[in-house]
Amino acid sequence: VTSITLDLVNPTAGQYSSFVDKIRNNVKDPNLKYGGTDIAVIGPPSKDKFLRINFQSSRGTVSLGLKRDNLYVVAYLAMDNTNVNRAYYFRSEITSAELTALFPEATAANHKALEYTEDYHSIEKNAQITEGDKSRKELGLGINLLSSTMDTVNKKVRVVKNEARFLLIAIQMTAEAVRFRYIQNLVTKNFPNKFNSENKVIKFEVNWKKISTAIHGDAKNGVFNKDYDFGFGKVRLVKDLQMGLLMHLGKPK
């Protein structure tokens, strides 16, 4: 299993960007391009199913498991308050045997299936967000926020609300930043501060498949055949979307 690590002790914007680029380069098919663009495209599913992301702080490491063929989160690993490694997983996404290969530090007895599902809506419900529209948007983003939410699951008694909030931030700071350079750039621009998220970020996140499909099927030389609106105004030039990684949709059209 490939591991990619982000050091959160004294990170720089450059280190964060190169961490995001490493994930992108690791899962892309270097020979695949869609719509006459040079945007990275995820490679086809292979035997190598998972990618391990490590967040290192001065108090220890918390790890995330992502599916290589779509970057969906499948599990995370953290020490509990007695310094025992525990792996928590979404049971529809990964088997116990695969979890052992991904996080060998946690014994099978210390595997726990999460009581909710891996979609944003379910995680948000468990994060108990009371502000605004009660979505992940209300939590904000940023490297300091990633560090502080990671601290709530690192060497602590498990609290579902804290765990869900950590997952919401960690998913966006890894998988979503890899998919969308727009999000990656917001993080580096505000680095290392927490910043308010915006509707455009959420629109990107929920439209990854739609955007990938439009670029794959309806763009030539980086120009769409018609105007597209993904929730933040009309777009004709693919580059205006600042995409980082497209979904695997087979051969180019």
Swiss-Prot record:
Keyword Protein transport annotated: no
SUPFAM superfamilies reported in the protein's UniProt record: Ribosome inactivating proteins (RIP)
Annotated keywords: Hydrolase, Plant defense, Protein synthesis inhibitor, Toxin
Keyword Hydrolase: yes
Top-level EC class as recorded in UniProt: hydrolase
Recorded GO MF terms: rRNA N-glycosylase activity; toxin activity
Pfam family, one: RIP
GO terms for biological process, alphabetical: defense response; negative regulation of translation
Catalytic center residues: 176
Highest taxon in the source lineage: Eukaryota
Enzyme Commission designation: 3.2.2.22
Catalytic activity as recorded in UniProt: Endohydrolysis of the N-glycosidic bond at one specific adenosine on the 28S rRNA
Described function: Ribosome-inactivating protein of type 1, inhibits protein synthesis in animal cells.
Similarity comment: family membership: Belongs to the ribosome-inactivating protein family. Type 1 RIP subfamily.
The protein's name: Ribosome-inactivating protein saporin-9
Organism expressing this protein natively: Saponaria officinalis (Common soapwort)
The gene coding this protein: SAP9
